[in-house]
Amino acid sequence: MVLETLSTLFSTLGSAASTAKAFKDLLQSNKGNARLLLEELKKNSTLTWLVVERQVEPAKIIPQLTTQAYDRLLAQNYNFNELSPKKKKIADKASLEGSDLASFIGKDVAEVIESIYDRIKEMQTIFGVDPANERIDWNRRVLNLHKRILLLMLHLRGVLS
């Protein structure tokens, strides 16, 4: 059911290959700090796709998720909204209403990026302390991260604006 929801919401980015192509297109049109952040998001997206497509267990990718570019840009007070100068806010689209991403409607790019990296850091912290905790559904956590990354990609490509 969760994968069906993903397919419905993100049919334009419904595979690792199409997401990689979308990142490639965005990377070609961005330079400097924006490109650095997009490269990091691309890597994190690739890792989450491995879990979504059931190729690897979350335990193998969680330690590999990276936040270095984000952390550096955050320390420099980078304006993450510059990734999308024309489309600042997530539009109210029917495909988002009633979904677990509905809370992002009306949020700006910086808020979506912050939520992505907050999820990564939280997941890595909890995983580092108690990786074998059976009460934590690591697949669901990675899937939720994956959906946020795809939401950002769709917005940056203009699909949700």
Residue ranges and their predicted role:
Residues L13, A20, K24, K31, ...:
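A near-ubiquitous, low-amplitude feature marking generic local secondary-structure context
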Residues M1-L27:
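Short, cationic, amphipathic peptide segments
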Residues I62-I90:
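Amphipathic alpha-helical blocks and their helix-capping loop/short-beta junctions
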Residues N30-N33, N44, N77-N81, N133, ...:
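Detector for Asparagine
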Residues L3-L6, L27-L41, S99-I113, N139:
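Amphipathic, non-membrane alpha-helical segments in soluble helical-bundle scaffolds
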Residues M1, Q55, A59-I62, G128, ...:
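Compositionally biased, intrinsically disordered low-complexity regions enriched
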Residues T19-L73, H146:
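Amphipathic, membrane-active segments
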Residues P85-S161:
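An amphipathic alpha-helical interaction surface
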